[in-house]
Amino acid sequence: KKVMWDAYTRVSTSTGNRYPEVSRLLKQQQQAGALIMDYAGHGVEYQISHESVLTISDFRTFTNQNLPLWITASCDVMPFDTRKETIGETALLNAQGGSVAFWGTTRTVYAYYNKFINNAFLRHVLSFTNGKPTTMGEAQRLAKNDVISTGQDRTLNKLQYSLLGDPALALNLPTFDVVIDSINGLPVGGKQDIILKAGSVARVKGRVMRQEETLAGFNGQMTATVRDTREMVTCKKQEETSNSAFQYYDRQKVLFNGSDSVRNGEFQFTFAVPFDINYASGSGLINVYAVSDDHTQLAHGAEDRFFIYGSETVRNDSIGPSIYCYLNTPSFVEGGSVNTTPYF
């Protein structure tokens, strides 16, 4: 989920400007169990952003069960060597929620250099070393080395970043792949374009793979999210110092989110394409996450080699569905005898 402050309405209060919708979205992602919460912007040890989108009180009261890794490319969010209470320490020490680890800064840092070390850390912490997810401590070491060997001096912020948490801990990354084989009977990546139209029904088939082979022993549950085409989002230019409105691309519409079973490494699901699509020719996106019944195997994958645009010709059906009601059993007849607590 990409959340850009200025894309949402700013509210002026007696204590300063606020983005209530942004605060709600971030807390929602935290509660839902995001794998990583990554923030880039202004901050201090007691709040994130000038607009107090999240405060140290929020990190103290989070009650989420699935703990994310928090990353803050921001000034002074976790100066743990001071006597002040900090967001980083509070998130890590929250016994009811917060974060599994916190990677952030202890001193002032500069935005231009932040993006390089932030991207490097993300790349490594989401990668594998010797077939296993890279530990957070190793990801930090590799990220700090990366900014040294780029051919430019991008090391200015390097010593300000620290990891609060167990350096031997790694994220619970999926180790198997999910592949979408066909949509509406057409092979993905084939010669014929796959087009999903508003009002149509899509039938998707796929597999869980290991080293180019179907993982036939995988049985469990998969969750699929289908997103609409990318669209240009223009921010509101609510910051007085901005010369122009910031623009970025995002997939803002979720067309389907649902789960189904995986049997012998194979799955299929069906969904109706809603009518409120973007109606701009472009590729859609399917994300799939699967977990085995015993929760020991994880798989994920994505597919964007299909298009979403246009409308399906839908037959005008003005006749409502038939509904049949009965008590206890479908063979019930009107006026029949039932017990004192019949099942309706």
What are these regions (language model features)?
Residues V314-F344:
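N-terminal non-catalytic regions of secreted/periplasmic and cell-surface proteins
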Residues K1-S259, R263-A272, A280-G282, V288-T313, ...:
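Cysteine-dependent hydrolase recognition
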